[in-house]
């Protein structure tokens, strides 16, 4: 089966000087969190889970 030919927009290449990957755009809605805050929150979450495991081990006995 032959597909109908459609025109596609040419692929664009970012030729700007900023080669750092953008995690969010300025126009996007929602919470804008930097990588340092994400790392800090994930470490807090891991510590909280470890504390819950330790508390569960001692309260079950």
Curated annotation (Swiss-Prot):
Stretch forming the signal peptide: none
Transmembrane segments: 36-56
InterPro entries: Sec61-beta/Sbh (IPR030671), SecG/Sec61-beta/Sbh (IPR016482)
GO molecular function: guanyl-nucleotide exchange factor activity
Protein name: Protein transport protein Sec61 subunit beta
Gene: sec61b
Role according to the record: Component of SEC61 channel-forming translocon complex that mediates transport of signal peptide-containing precursor polypeptides across the endoplasmic reticulum (ER). Forms a ribosome receptor and a gated pore in the ER membrane, both functions required for cotranslational translocation of nascent polypeptides.
Ranges in coiled-coil conformation: none
UniProt KW Ligase keyword: no
């Amino acid at each position: 089966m032959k597909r109908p030919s459609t025109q596609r927009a040419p692929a664009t290449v970012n030729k700007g000087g900023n080669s750092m990957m953008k995690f969010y755009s300025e126009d996007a809605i929602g919470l804008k969190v930097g990588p340092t805050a994400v790392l800090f929150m994930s470490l807090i979450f891991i510590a909280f889970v470890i504390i819950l495991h330790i508390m569960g081990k001692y309260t079950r006995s």
